[in-house]
């Protein structure tokens, strides 16, 4: 997949089949759009183009909001889009000035004139232009005028739950990791660097890798204990992670840590990715470290049993 950072980098491609969006979750609904684009591109001997924005429009339009968190980092989003077989990714810098672009200008001057759109595929809730003023009806009118095709993908649902990034974010905030993973179509993950902790886990036989995130806008799933898969370089492991404040040792800062099963390597300053599979329990304050140790033994048994049943 070729990535273009700005319209000035983009070179027109043959019969471009295009979609536009922020694609925070890159979820199953988005995958349906990408699949349709690929099929259309094959039928017209064209190429697929995803148009997205950086930074996320909400960060520009609502710069003072303290609760803006996103499911995927920019790097993870791009990687997922590539995995779905897209040919070209055009990243348009989203500025205050660009946020004032009206719907007609966006379609005619950008999608039509600069990209040379042949066909456009959008989701059921797609709006475009300043203040999301452009509706699908307006899009169809512009498509007729400029002579390109437009298609809207209906809402996708699983178990009668309509798939949307908002629903996924809410599921993560509530700790409903299985629901979030189902709607995403893959396991929610956190990537970060391993930093030094207070080594209390090591003292009680459960050494942990403490993770420091490199993206302040990354959405962290709810506090609790989780069954996890861990990727370090090209190696994969099973383990159990904790997100919380470690109340048993009176820690006041939110920490992300993972105990990796059958693992005894020094990985300080290394980058690892934690994939969250299931939420095991709430974080609890125990009377002492011995009580915590006994509970961790039970947690490990629960997690291993869960993985063995997969």
Predicted regions and their residues:
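Short acidic-hydrophobic, aromatic-tinged amphipathic segments that line or gate anion-handling sites
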Residues: 2-8, 90
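N-terminal catalytic cores of NTP/NDP-binding nucleotidyl/phosphoryl-transfer enzymes
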Residues: 7-69, 73
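A short acidic, often aromatic-flanked loop/helix-cap motif at beta-alpha or helix-coil junctions
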Residues: 9-12, 96-99, 157-162
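Residue-level signal for inorganic ion chemistry
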Residues: 27, 81, 120, 180, ...
């Amino acid at each position: 997949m070729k990535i273009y950072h700005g319209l000035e980098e983009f070179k027109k491609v043959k019969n471009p089949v295009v979609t536009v969006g922020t694609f925070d979750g890159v979820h199953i609904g988005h995958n349906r759009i990408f699949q349709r684009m690929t099929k259309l591109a094959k039928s017209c001997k064209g190429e697929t183009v995803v148009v997205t924005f950086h930074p996320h429009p909400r960060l520009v339009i609502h710069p003072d909001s303290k609760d803006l968190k996103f499911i995927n980092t920019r790097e993870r989003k791009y990687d997922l889009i590539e995995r779905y077989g897209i040919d070209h990714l055009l990243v348009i810098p989203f500025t205050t000035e660009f946020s004032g672009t009206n719907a007609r200008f966006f379609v005619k001057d950008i999608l039509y004139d600069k990209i040379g759109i042949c066909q456009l595929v959008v989701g059921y809730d797609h709006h475009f232009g300043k203040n999301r003023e452009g509706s699908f009806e307006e899009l169809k009118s512009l498509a007729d005028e400029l002579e390109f095709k437009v298609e809207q993908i209906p809402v996708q649902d699983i178990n009668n739950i309509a798939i949307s990034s908002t629903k996924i974010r809410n599921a993560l905030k509530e700790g409903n990791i299985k629901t979030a993973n189902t709607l995403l179509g893959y396991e929610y993950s956190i990537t970060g660097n391993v930093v030094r902790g207070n080594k209390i886990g090591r003292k009680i036989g459960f050494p942990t890798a403490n993770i420091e995130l490199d993206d302040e806008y990354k959405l962290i799933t709810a506090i609790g204990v989780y069954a996890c898969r861990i990727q370090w370089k090209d190696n994969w492991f099973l383990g159990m992670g904790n997100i919380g404040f470690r109340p048993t040792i009176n820690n006041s800062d939110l920490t992300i840590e993972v105990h990796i099963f059958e693992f005894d390597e020094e990985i300080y300053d290394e980058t690892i990715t934690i994939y969250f599979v299931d939420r095991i329990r709430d974080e609890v304050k125990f009377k002492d470290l011995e009580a915590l140790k006994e509970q961790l033994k039970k947690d490990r048994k629960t997690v291993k049993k869960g993985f063995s049943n997969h």
